[in-house]
Amino acid sequence: VPLIASTPVTVCPPASTTLDAHAGASFGVQSVCRTLADANATLERFAWLGDQLAIAVWTRDIDVAETAYDHPGHHTLSCYIDGGYRTERQKIPGRFGAPQRLCALPGDHESRWWVRGHMHFLHLYFLPEHFTRRAVLELDREPRELTLADRTYFEDPRIAALCQSLAQLPWDGIDERLRANEISHEVLSLLLRGQSVRRENAVIKGGLAVSTRRRLRDYIDANLTETLTLGELSNVACLSEFHLARMFRTSFGMPPHAWIAQQRIDRARGLLRATALPLEQVAALCGFANGSHFSHRFRAAAGASPLAYRRAMTPA
């Protein structure tokens, strides 16, 4: 369930740049990536994958050091590739890392670690908003009640295998980054189903009734080929335009126009992967005005043209 890219939020810079030159507006000095860089970990590879997803491979070799994460503002999935046998999280003594072991670190978490010896690991960085939209689409859940669980050294063979695939992919070319993007979204879906929890003391106030949220979600999906307006959606919800705009954002995690735009891009991705339809027909089926409008919007969202995306997603 990709997020349409706006201005990228900088979690971590490419290896050839400095951290200070790439401090993001939403992720500040406490980001996991910056913390590791300040701890003299070696950033071997880094890439933006589109949809405000970032990926990195790190190496650390040290006798012993303490590393602390403090409300990084973004979620992190860590998968150990090699080593980590003597690294442990404080307050969970005696539980150590190992290849294919995973850690899920929510954006609002705090943790302190004793790092010892060699470790080689992959990080996938993503935003809380990735869970918000998936909660509605994949689980039909109230998005405000779910968040990523704080997990240390859990095992999930499916997620670990996907992380190994990500680590083995080159990230230099557009095709490879697109494939990495698809794998990353598969990882996020598995995390949502297996490593999400209800927010502690979650009090859900305001927003749309569950039945209204479902009715709007289904109506939008059934009418993506049309020009959907706020007035039309307000009639479906039996609310004024003013109240719908406010309540929609609360219950869907984004305003109506952004949700509709995301749905159009999602449908386009599916059609490009599964069919050989001409681009003009794909554009029409997804509600874009014309092929040019579709190509422009798709490139902004996916980081590649529709043709490049289709080529990357077509098995060799």
Residues of each region from the PLM?
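Regular secondary-structure segments
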Residues: A160-W171, R217, D221-L224, R269-R273
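Short, Lys/Arg-enriched N-terminal segment that forms or immediately precedes the first helix
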Residues: R198-I204, T250-F252
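Residue at a beta-strand N-cap/secondary-structure junction
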Residues: T227, A276-L277
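Membrane-cytosol interface segments
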Residues: P2-L49, T59-D61
